[in-house]
Design a protein with these regions (language model features):
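N-terminal FAD cofactor-binding segment of flavoenzymes
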Residues: 1-58
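Long, low-complexity C-terminal extensions of enzymes
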Residues: 248, 252-332
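Short, glycine/charge-rich beta-strand/loop segments that flank catalytic centers
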Residues: 19-30, 102-107, 204-206
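FAD/FMN-dependent oxidoreductases across multiple families
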Residues: 168, 177-287
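Predominantly flavin-linked oxidoreductase catalytic cores and closely associated redox partners
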Residues: 78-197, 226, 243
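Short, charged/polar micro-motifs that form catalytic or ligand-binding hotspots
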Residues: 20-25, 70-78, 154, 177, ...
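Active-site catalytic microenvironments for nucleophilic, acid-base chemistry
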Residues: 9-10, 90-93, 245, 249-253
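Conserved N-terminal helical subregion
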Residues: 35-105, 118
Length: 332
């Protein structure tokens, strides 16, 4: 839903959807997290703005001819590689001068936005509960009910989790896992057996965050600033939040970039990261799974997480309830 802010500012309509094979997304279905047979659903609702009962009625009956209008009730699923050239053309229309060249980030003559992804990411390890480090992805033809699905599905396994993301013309599938417990070939074999996938894209990643993402000369955004893990697409949210925070703070500081600005930006961003880390930790820390070496390693850190657990202030009661109802641990 946070991407609505971005798309509504950039595009006049949703014609880009067909160009990127995009579909609407109204909720996320998480299977196998509390235990191997569990299932929980997170509608894209927010009890700070929505009537939750009305929201659930709308999204669970949503289809192509019945799209909820509420601002926080849907997101999009798309092929991002097809969106890139559309955004480039839109930038040109808006008068942005695109320069393609290698940049020296030690250069202090101009202010630069660091979008280098993992190449620009160092810093603190996210959490001992979040140990995945690799994703393998691909596309397959529609199967079962995926042409009628308006949600993303994840399925926790003995090492990480699968995902299924229906698009207009195919389904994005893949696996996030810890390379300590399976080889690349083993995961590819599982994906082939599960989905018939035979063309693979491997994406190693680092689960880290920078405490200092803004300086007098650079601003890190996206996975150059932080990467929690692919679950719940938090990096997309953080990109939008980074840009919005920077814009609003510039206005508050009368477009003056100084030491005080840098200090407050970094404090705000760090708080945002830590809040979302707690949310992501909950999937692992509140689960009772201990049926494999992967889950046994995570289990070593659950007690500390549960004993010290506090929900971020801005998560609505509905989200808290969905998380605690979906998983077998209940907050004291």
């Amino acid at each position: 839903p946070y991407m609505r802010f971005f798309f509504e500012k950039v595009f006049d309509d949703e014609s880009w959807m067909d160009q990127t094979n995009a579909t609407y997304k109204f909720y996320i279905k998480h299977d196998g997290w509390a235990n191997e047979n569990s299932s929980m659903i997170f509608p894209l609702c927010d009890d700070r703005f929505d009537d939750i009962e009305e929201c659930e009625r709308e999204i669970f009956s949503a289809d192509k001819n019945n799209v909820p209008e509420c601002s926080s009730r849907h997101a999009w699923q798309m092929q991002s590689v097809l969106l890139q050239p559309i955004l480039i053309e839109k930038c040109k229309e808006l008068g942005v001068n695109l320069i393609e060249e290698n940049y020296d980030f030690s250069n202090t003559d101009i202010f630069a936005i660091d979008c280098r992804g993992f190449d620009g990411l160092g810093g603190e390890v996210i959490s001992p509960l979040i140990i995945n480090d690799t994703a393998i992805a691909g596309h397959v033809n529609h199967f079962k009910d995926t042409e009628q699905r308006y949600y993303t599905r994840t399925n926790a396994t003995d090492n990480g989790w699968f995902w299924e993301i229906p698009l207009q013309n195919k389904v994005g599938v893949g696996r996030v896992y810890c390379s300590k417990y399976n080889t690349e070939d083993e995961i590819k074999k599982q994906l082939n057996e599960q989905y018939g996938l035979d063309t693979f894209l491997k994406v190693p990643f680092k689960t880290k965050y920078k405490e200092t993402v803004c300086t007098m000369h650079t601003l890190k955004v996206g996975s150059a600033a932080a990467f929690i893990e692919p679950l719940e697409a938090t990096t997309l949210l953080l990109v939008v939040y980074s840009c919005y925070l920077f814009k609003e703070m510039l206005k508050s500081f009368s477009f003056r970039l100084d030491d005080d600005f840098v200090k407050h930006y970094n404090l705000n961003f760090k708080q945002m990261i830590q809040n979302h880390i707690v949310f992501m930790e909950s999937f692992y820390g509140l689960s009772d799974r201990n049926d494999s070496p992967y889950w046994n390693e995570i289990d070593k850190h659950r007690k500390q997480f549960r004993d010290s657990h506090e929900w971020p202030e801005f998560y609505g009661e509905y989200i808290k309830k969905k998380m605690y109802d979906g998983l077998s641990y209940n907050i004291k």
